[in-house]
Amino acid sequence: MRVLFAVMTVATLLLPQQRGYSPIQDGDAHGDPPFLLEEGWEPLLNGTDLTGWKACDPAAKNEWYTARAVRFERHLGPTQLQGRQGAGGTMLNGPAGRTANLCTEKAFGDVELYLEFMLAKGSNSGVYLQGLYEVQIFDSWGSTEPMTTSDGGAVYHQWIGERGVGGSAPLVNAARRPGEWQSYQIWFRAPRFDASGKKIESARFERVLFNGQLVQRDVNLDGATRAALSIPEAAQHPLMLQGDHGPVAFRNIYARPLRPLIVR
């Protein structure tokens, strides 16, 4: 009986791939993180140090550090995160939560990205695909106001003529309370260029899941969002994590090549 149960369990785990399930979920699949369940994921943190990462601005003060663990104590300091500094798979943006923005040394084009993050109360960060297009990280937990392009899960707006333009508010408020680990899964399609270098298709967020809930679908990006790197749009650029807007911790950052979108 135990052998039969084991065989049935393995078969059940294999069924989704055998049935050709869509590589892009719309928030209807839950369980362990995708990098544990699916093939092709590349870790962007090595579990020891910050190899593979650098300050986006070489002249900026870089206080990012790795930690074995991170702690949030609401009654002692709700606006702070405390990391146990040393070799580990979590990274924090300095003791004060305000330091340089961090970039990968590797450049990415079309990519599927998964990452986990923790915020202190009222904190703010962002993940910039290609250093240009931001999915906002913000403490929106408990908000009952209509969602805006400044809330967690938003595609942040551009800044044109001293005002915010465009962007995309999240479809739902999926934020968890400060001090809890949260996750993004992002499907990003890079801009397209012709042989002369002229852009012929805008970049696009095909899907964004925030804590497993669908918050963005097919959002075209006419240009870089606010506070992006001062670089031109291109087929490939590094990933950027914002480090100068308040305490944030990151772990389990994985990437793999974007697969075709199959709507089921």
Question: Where do the protein language model's features map onto the residues?
Answer:
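Hydrophobic h-region of N-terminal signal peptides that target proteins for export
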Residues: M8-Q17
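Positively charged n-region of N-terminal signal peptides that target proteins for export
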Residues: M1-L4
